[in-house]
Swiss-Prot record:
The lineage of its organism: Bacteria, Bacillati, Bacillota, Clostridia, Eubacteriales. It is an enzyme of class 3 (hydrolase). It comes from Clostridium perfringens (strain ATCC 13124 / DSM 756 / JCM 1290 / NCIMB 6125 / NCTC 8237 / Type A). Its main location: cytoplasm. Keywords: Cytoplasm, Endonuclease, Hydrolase, Metal-binding, Nuclease, Ribosome biogenesis, rRNA processing, Zinc. SUPFAM superfamilies: Metalloproteases ('zincins'), catalytic domain (SSF55486). This is Endoribonuclease YbeY. GO terms for biological process: rRNA processing. HAMAP family: Endoribonucl_YbeY.
């Protein structure tokens, strides 16, 4: 299940947008071979709120586009499909029958700014950032160049399969 929580009032959150982002989340989980029913929270905020969260959780006092809060730990250089395909999780990882993957906090304000900066649509930028964040929930990272290349390649591959291009 995907929970949507709109905590900002600067941008209208349309049913079309939420449906598209839910589709992206579900698609990424399927493509990454996640077989369990999962719970993901997607929270929409503005730059002020994400700046506060970023400062509180990472010690970085500036707005960012998206933050990911995975509930599952991953060994270094491993992602969900490398480690957990046949794994039986303890009950503490579940809410009812759903595996809790984690939370995505998305600044719609920053999303709009970046869509203008990168000269593509707001929807494309939102889909990219949600794809990026779901991959973080599944263990992908971009702290090292090799990890970054792997993650960027996977993002582009997934968005391509969804026909979400930079021209979108």
């Amino acid at each position: 299940m995907i929970f949507i929580d709109n905590r900002q009032n600067k941008f209208e959150v349309t049913e079309e947008l939420t449906k598209k982002l839910e589709e992206v989340i579900s698609f990424v989980l399927k493509e990454e071979k996640v077989k369990e029913d999962c719970e993901v929270s997607l929270v929409f905020v503005d730059n002020e709120e994400i700046r506060g969260i970023n400062n509180e959780t990472r010690g970085i006092d500036r707005a960012t586009d998206v933050l990911s809060f995975p509930m599952i730990d991953y060994p270094e250089d491993k992602v969900y499909k490398d480690v957990y395909l046949e794994h039986e999780f303890d009950k503490c990882y579940f809410d009812g029958d759903e595996l809790i993957l984690g939370d995505i906090v998305l600044s719609l304000e920053r999303t709009k700014e970046q869509s203008i900066e990168f000269n593509h649509s707001f929807e494309r930028e939102a889909c990219y950032l949600v794809t990026h964040s779901v991959l973080h929930l599944l263990g992908y990272d971009h702290m090292e160049e090799e990890e970054k290349a792997r993650m960027r390649g996977r993002e582009e591959e997934l968005l391509g399969k969804l026909n979400i291009t930079r021209e979108s």
